[in-house]
């Protein structure tokens, strides 16, 4: 902490807060990226907010994304190839239960983890979908469009999104997979732009046939989105990857054409809609054609195709599709202007957290209404005193930052725009994680066979994924050859004692530092037969902490709070690391000095030990509050041995106060609050 922080410059927190975590598809269990890149950070933040602004003022919601073509295609393969006989809803529910169990294994505790197609949220979500689509229609921002959809002439059926594969047409995209109208990096495009389409059902090249769908007029919000994005620049709470990604989508509609097609382009340029041409600069291999709007750009596709000119599209706003014709989806009311349609999974997944909020609030109200401070969902999503924090992966910034932002504005409900806490990819062994690679990453649940939840929570939070992609390289799965065994067989890194496991780095802070400080405090005041020391009262010692300890605790709390406000979670952990190590050293030095004096002067030594324990208890208490969201189980165990109710112990109302003040707030006299006795050789953190 380079400069001293002031209590007068603390951040302002919302009155109420929603925390969401990106929803995993219902066709599989969670992979480590889901847990380490989204759910653990969201859980950390939600736990912090509960302590900071009150448990009743925080709702952490997430759930399984039950609908959509990925689920349909996975279910179809399971049904056709492996004879799975249950309904698709049973398939999704089984995966949902596996996801919930995995999250519980990592001590991730949403207030509500539901499913968009599952009870108790399913009918609330259907109602929410109707309300939003009809409201957008009322606002005049929906449009019925006849667009083209892939049709397999061999299978004689329309193909849903994941039943068509090809290459992404967006300029500069490095996606390995593209589907009917989006790639796996989140780029949106028209089906006719997909390069080399192939049916996943038959392997044949599908045809394009016209279908009617409902679209949200996203391009009309270009100026609004430009202004919104401009305001985010320089905002300390917004990660740079969010602003950078939003800006990429706010360009005019453009096509990129390789120079080798210039002659063919020149031959048909007169047939194109209004446009401008920008010649390539330097050694660039393509020139740029810019259009006034997406309509002119789309009209140009047919002309260019007829002229034999191949092209790639630039990122730009296009109408955002709300509906589709797949059977497994949220039904869309015929009042929208089309009949027999379902909602496309991406838009309905954007308002699914609102549906989950409504479901959780209704359940609490029915049970007596004591858990949450307000039971109207608008008090959480539409009130300027409330705020929404959405933890997502970088690939989903377009949907949450572009499409959702514009739709929320279009609704006219005063929907509060979210803070998007977007993380870069978690790499695996230094490379992008892929289930088809030579060393596929393990499922998140399997990691718990090798590491504790707290080791993994601390490690994932240390990676700093808000700043860059970082590799997750657990030694337990490291198959690199690092030498030879005595019998001449290859020695793998996972079995090599010389290889350090990076996952365990943060765990040593818990076992070697945090654990020692906690043990020292509780054992230090424990009543011990035959020990003449006056500090062994079984109670938290009364008295003011030293200036050094009090200032260190205050500065740590303020720095931690600032880091959390900026959603710099790895820096918040870094504050805890530095504070714990300093506190542990302070205790070590002070207790050694006290013991040395006790040998010759029991009273003087006891006075020094008393002060050392006052300092240590203060620093342990503050560290436990700060670390609560990072390693909740161990911190709650420490709280249990303080023998103070968690709602009082973890509340930030007391974090900057002395320990005497906390004890007095309990209605007790300082020096009389008894701690829970610690059994011999007890560890709060041991792995």
Predicted feature descriptions by range:
Residues 98-179, 221-222, 226-234:
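A broadly conserved sequence feature marking short terminus-proximal activation segments
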Residues 2-53, 59-62, 127, 198-527, ...:
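Structured secondary-structure scaffolds
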Residues 495-496, 521-539, 544-575, 579-599, ...:
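Active-site-proximal binding-pocket segments
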Residues 38, 506-513, 517, 545, ...:
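Amphipathic alpha-helix face/heptad-repeat signature
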Residues 44, 90-101, 131, 509, ...:
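A non-catalytic, amphipathic alpha-helix used as a structural packing/dimerization or gating element
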Residues 162-172, 176, 477-482, 491-509, ...:
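Extended, non-catalytic structural segments that build the interaction scaffolds
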Residues 74-94:
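A charged helix-plus-loop insertion that forms the helical arch/lid used to bind
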Residues 1-14, 145-150, 163-186, 192, ...:
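Basic, alpha-helical terminal appendages of large translation-related enzymes
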């Amino acid at each position: 902490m380079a400069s001293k922080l002031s209590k007068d410059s603390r951040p302002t927190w919302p009155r109420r807060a929603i925390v969401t975590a990106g929803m995993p598809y219902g066709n599989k269990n969670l992979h480590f990226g889901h847990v380490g890149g989204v759910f653990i950070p969201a859980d950390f933040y939600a736990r912090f907010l509960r302590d900071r602004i009150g448990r009743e003022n925080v709702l952490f919601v997430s759930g399984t994304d039950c609908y959509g073509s990925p689920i349909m295609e996975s279910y179809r393969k399971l049904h056709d190839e492996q004879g799975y006989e249950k309904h698709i809803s049973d398939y999704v529910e089984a995966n949902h239960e596996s996801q919930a169990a995995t999250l519980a294994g990592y001590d991730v505790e949403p207030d509500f983890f539901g499913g968009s197609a599952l009870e108790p949220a399913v009918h609330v979500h259907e109602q929410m979908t109707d309300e939003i689509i009809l409201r957008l229609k009322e606002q005049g921002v929906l449009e019925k469009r006849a667009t083209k959809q892939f049709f397999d002439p061999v299978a004689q059926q329309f193909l849903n999104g994941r039943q068509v594969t090809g290459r992404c047409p967006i300029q500069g995209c490095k996606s390995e997979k593209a589907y009917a109208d989006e790639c796996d990096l989140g780029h949106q495009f028209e089906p006719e732009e997909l390069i080399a389409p192939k049916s996943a059902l038959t392997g044949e090249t599908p045809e394009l046939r016209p279908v009617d769908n409902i679209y949200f007029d996203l391009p009309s919000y270009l100026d609004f989105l430009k202004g919104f994005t401009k305001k985010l620049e320089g905002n300390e709470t917004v990660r740079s990857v969010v602003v950078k990604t939003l800006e990429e989508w706010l360009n005019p509609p453009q096509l990129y054409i390789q120079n080798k097609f210039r002659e063919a382009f020149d031959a048909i340029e007169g047939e194109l809609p209004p446009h401008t041409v920008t010649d390539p600069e330097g050694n660039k291999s393509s020139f740029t054609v810019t259009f006034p709007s997406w309509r002119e750009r789309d009209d140009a596709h047919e002309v260019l195709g007829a002229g034999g000119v191949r092209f790639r599209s630039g990122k730009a706003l296009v109408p955002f599709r709300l509906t589709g014709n797949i059977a497994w989806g949220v039904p869309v009311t015929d009042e929208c202007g089309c009949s027999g349609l379902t909602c496309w999974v991406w838009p309905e997944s954007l308002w699914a957290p609102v549906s989950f909020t409504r479901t959780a609030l209704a359940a609490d109200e029915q049970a007596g209404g004591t858990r949450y401070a307000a039971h109207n969902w608008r008090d959480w999503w539409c009130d300027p005193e409330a705020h929404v924090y959405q933890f997502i992966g970088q690939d989903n910034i377009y949907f949450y930052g572009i499409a959702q932002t514009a739709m929320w504005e279009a609704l006219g409900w005063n929907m509060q725009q979210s803070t998007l806490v977007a993380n870069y990819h978690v790499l695996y062994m230094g490379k992008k994680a892929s289930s088809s690679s030579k060393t596929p990453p393990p499922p998140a649940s399997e990691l718990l066979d090798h590491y504790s939840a707290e080791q993994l929570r601390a490690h994932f939070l240390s990676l700093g994924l808000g700043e860059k992609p970082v590799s997750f390289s657990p030694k337990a799965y490291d198959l690199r050859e690092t030498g030879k065994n005595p019998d001449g067989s290859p020695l793998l890194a996972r079995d090599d004692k010389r290889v350090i496991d990076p996952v365990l780095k943060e765990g040593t802070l818990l076992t070697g530092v945090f654990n020692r400080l906690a043990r020292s405090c509780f054992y230090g005041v424990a009543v011990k037969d035959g020990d003449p020391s006056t500090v062994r009262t079984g109670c938290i010692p009364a008295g003011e902490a030293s200036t050094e300890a009090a200032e260190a605790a205050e500065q740590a709390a303020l720095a931690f709070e600032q880091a959390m406000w900026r959603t710099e979670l790895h820096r918040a952990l870094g504050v805890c690391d530095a504070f714990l190590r300093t506190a542990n050293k302070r205790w070590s030095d002070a207790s050694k000095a006290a013991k040395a004096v006790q040998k010759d002067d029991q009273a003087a030594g006891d006075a020094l030990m008393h002060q050392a324990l006052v300092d240590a208890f203060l620093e342990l208490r503050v560290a436990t509050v700060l670390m609560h969201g990072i390693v909740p189980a161990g911190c709650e165990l420490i709280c249990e041995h303080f023998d103070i109710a968690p709602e009082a112990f973890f509340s930030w109302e007391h974090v900057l106060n002395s320990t005497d003040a906390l004890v007095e707030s309990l209605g007790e006299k300082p020096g009389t609050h008894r701690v829970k006795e610690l059994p011999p050789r007890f560890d709060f953190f041991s792995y």
